[in-house]
């Protein structure tokens, strides 16, 4: 609770430790203007954070119409964006997974991610922007972009041009050549 108050900027009125969801007590519900912003599921520092804990927190958050959930053992902090899906379990999208005081100490990335948990970031648009940035660059989208016909064609031209400049030899590369090489680099089902 001290971290939430002293580091992340929440007032006592923002923090609810008595709220229930799905017949269970929520460890901490972070509220703003009466709306639940964030559900925090706390575990002992000696415990790992398995998928079941993430799903439990996400279901609590969805039941309270909260967009965000955090699971933490104090050392590891994981922020998820919760997207309701009518008639199904909510979609859970990881925004970050950081370990405080690990081999890299308290890194700049840890600090930047931890900022996303602040009242300012959650009530403003910083956390939402970070979620959209991460989603726009997810593996599926990157692989789809790489495999787009225009990109493959541009890659074949660029590869042939740079090879010619470096080796003084003309090589004809087709889109099919590049696509075959991409399949070698990535699993075909990824493309």
Region annotations inferred by a language model:
Residues 1-68, 79-191:
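A short, conserved, highly charged catalytic patch centered on acidic carboxylates
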Residues 71-72:
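Acidic beta-strand-to-loop metal/phosphate-binding motif
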